């Protein structure tokens, strides 16, 4: 199963996260299928590739809780009916 989740980057004590589509069985730093955005919690910056996120959601990808919250704040799910997506 494909998941949309965070991948840690940056330096020590200064984490920046990439939002990636990745196989659910692989580890956090494993090889990703595609980068779909980034999140900087210190500066509170977010950049999302909305068409790529919608593509993976349409193919059945499951976002993690944090990625779901970030996407919801950015308004990604206003474009998709919530009846079409399942979040576990």
Swiss-Prot record:
Taxonomic superkingdom = Eukaryota
Q: Could you confirm whether the keyword Ribonucleoprotein appears in this record?
A: yes
GO CC field: chloroplast; ribonucleoprotein complex; ribosome
Q: Which GO terms describe its biological process?
A: translation
Report the locations given in the UniProt record. Plastid, Chloroplast
Pfam families on file: Ribosomal_S16
Gene3D superfamilies documented for this protein: 3.30.1320.10
Principal localisation: plastid
Tell me which UniProt keywords the record has, alphabetically.
Chloroplast, Plastid, Ribonucleoprotein, Ribosomal protein
Q: Which GO terms describe its molecular function?
A: structural constituent of ribosome
The similarity comment for this entry is: Belongs to the bacterial ribosomal protein bS16 family.
PANTHER family according to UniProt: 30S RIBOSOMAL PROTEIN S16, SMALL RIBOSOMAL SUBUNIT PROTEIN BS16M
Instruction: Please report the name of this protein according to its UniProt entry.
Output: Small ribosomal subunit protein bS16c
Organism ancestry: Eukaryota, Viridiplantae, Streptophyta, Embryophyta, Tracheophyta
